[in-house]
Amino acid sequence: SMNVGICGFGKMGQIRADAIETHGFAQIKSVFDVNIPDNCKYPVANSIDEIIEDPDIDIVFLCLPNYFNKPKTIMALKAGKHVFCEKPPAFSAQDVRDIQEVERASGKVLMYGFNHRQHGAIDKMKSIVDSRKFGSILWMRSRYGKSVDGDYLNTWRAKKELAGGGILLDQGIHMLDLLLYLTGKPFDEVHAMVSNMYWKTPGIEDNVFAIMRNTQTGVTASVHSTMTQWRHLFSLEVFMERGYMVLNGLKTSSGTYGDEILTIAQNRTTAPAATWEDEERLTFHIDQSWAREIELFFDSVQNGAPVKFGSSDQALEVMSLIDMIYEHDLHQAPNLADQLNMTVKELT
């Protein structure tokens, strides 16, 4: 039987601990956090590195502030541990490539926490896309938002060098991952507007609007990722040649995103004239995502199953897309109109 060490024992570390206990494949040997909860029933280590260097620990869970993710993933792989790391994997695609070099050399399992792929409604949507029942995807439209309170400004999340970015890297990354998952193809053309009008925190965006296209397939998608959504929202629409799927709400621990309700056009629905009577509605009452992720991770550790969800290749895809979104925004010169006018004058 295997021993687990959990680095970071806040909300996510505790969610992972519960799922590990329920699964039963491994024991939790120790945990570390700067603020250990009073009711912690596990032995507490003195540091992250103590867990990573412990010869009795086989598996390390990294549930830490973002800036630890890359260096501690590399350190744990080099120490011969299997690693499960929360998102974001790092701050850039190049960071993920650096991690992959170490991963390949280590021969250990590395999996990233992209739990949204494991939600019941997403599972259903993916199976419908893959069945081609409604033909190919034409477009996808997505919105994901929450609000944060003033305390937010006092945490590591409000510092660019510690968080790496704002809402896109924190929450929007999940939606981008789902768009990539459902289409199965990367987006190579990106237009984006990134802003921090409300919290005005340097380098920490509170809103991102992005439109993306795969220039070969023509599949186009939009995402709005926001932390000024005063009433929390999750919405993902996928329209195909002969039907559609609309997911509103997401079953989460906070319960603030509403019921996870998936509306699907029935088989007999043909474009262009569908009405609400032609739909089936499915409500997903249980968030199975945490249990499912642990099950998949332990299957890879125990049986050598390839990492199918949350692999470093998928992490590289989503980080490449995030790089493109941030870069596109930077390349939009604020005085573009003046520059163009100057060019026109020079030409004439």
State what each model feature region is.
Residues R281-E295, G310:
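Active-site loop of classical SDR/Rossmann-like NAD(P)-dependent oxidoreductases
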Residues D98-N115, G135-M140:
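Rossmann-fold dehydrogenase core element
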Residues L176-S254, A291-P306, M324, Q339-T348:
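Contiguous beta-strand/loop segments that form the cofactor/metal-binding neighborhood of enzyme cores
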Residues Q14, A26, I59-L62, Q216, ...:
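C-terminal helix-rich "cap/oligomerization" subdomain common to oxidoreductases
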Residues C85-E86, L110-Y112, L247:
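Hydrophobic residues in well-ordered beta-strands that form the structural core
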Residues R16, Y42-V102:
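Beta-loop-alpha module in the N-terminal Rossmann-like domain of NAD(P)-dependent dehydrogenases
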Residues H116-T201:
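Predominantly a Rossmann-like dinucleotide-binding segment in NAD(P)-dependent oxidoreductases
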Residues S1-C40:
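N-terminal Rossmann-like dinucleotide-binding module
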